[in-house]
A protein has these predicted regions:
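Active-site-adjacent segment of FAD-dependent monooxygenases/related oxidoreductases
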Residues: 44, 49-120, 209, 219-221
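Core beta-strand elements of the Rossmann-like FAD/NAD(P) dinucleotide-binding domain
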Residues: 3-5, 151-161
Length: 236
């Protein structure tokens, strides 16, 4: 049976967007839906590595991250007196066998906005402010039931494959009743992203301070941003 779309991607964050663009680049007929109108405007991920840049290079989109990212000098584990325990140095200009720097730090709202623009210019069909309602198996394909969140209109279409890129609380996973593996890590962290107003002398390396009283992490995010992460203790 001929379906309306070859692949439907649920969730258009960076993972869903890049999946859609890569499929479209291979002449796959793609529908992407997301329940939100706009990208999430707070930073979450901050790091992209050489393999990620290599994937973007296939789409000629590596500039999105290169123009919005900063290289770092290394990454270290420090004790509570800031003495180095272990880590790696990253020499300036060092390239891996993939032809890119091993890691760069970016500001996600910048890069996500540019990826969204690329998606909307592509041959992918896109429905925003549209929520997945149900996935109904029909032989060798699925009927995707959706609802427009602005006017309540329900729209259904057929697809050969479905990609669930809708995050930790994935509706695709819940509908399909897929198991979620729990790695039993239940610690909460306070993540503080700071936009600097003036030049600073903060180090250009990432560090985790292994203080037994409170573990914390410092990330020299893409200028003018910096990130600190603090583990929350019991009762906090």
């Amino acid at each position: 049976m001929k379906t309306d779309y070859d692949v439907t991607v649920i969730g258009l964050g960076p993972a869903g967007t890049l999946t859609s663009l890569l499929l479209s680049d291979s002449s796959v007929n793609v529908m992407g839906i997301d329940k939100e109108k706009d990208i999430y405007n707070l930073p979450r991920a901050v790091t992209i590595d050489d393999e990620g840049l290599r994937i973007l290079q296939r789409l000629n989109l590596e500039h999105i991250y290169l123009n919005n990212a900063t290289a770092i000098e290394g990454a270290y584990f420090l004790d509570d007196k800031l003495n180095k325990l272990s880590g790696i140095d990253i020499p300036s200009g060092h390239l891996t066998s993939n032809g890119w720097m091993p890691t760069m730090l970016f500001h996600q709202p910048y890069t996500d906005a540019l990826l969204r623009e690329e998606l909307l210019r592509s041959t992918c069909s896109v429905k925003l402010e549209t929520e997945l309602v149900d996935l109904i198996p029909k032989g060798n394909h699925y009927i995707v039931k959706t609802q427009n969140l602005t006017n309540g209109e329900e729209i259904s279409f057929s697809t050969q494959y479905v990609v669930g890129a809708d995050g930790a609380s994935s509706k695709v996973r819940n509908i399909m009743k897929f198991d979620q593996e729990d790695l039993d890590y239940d610690k909460n962290w306070l993540v503080v992203d700071v936009k600097l107003n003036v030049e600073n002398t903060l180090p250009r390396f990432a560090a985790q301070i292994c203080d037994p009283k409170r573990i914390c992490t410092y990330i020299p995010s893409h200028l003018p941003f910096r990130r600190w992460e603090f583990i929350l203790l019991e009762g906090e």
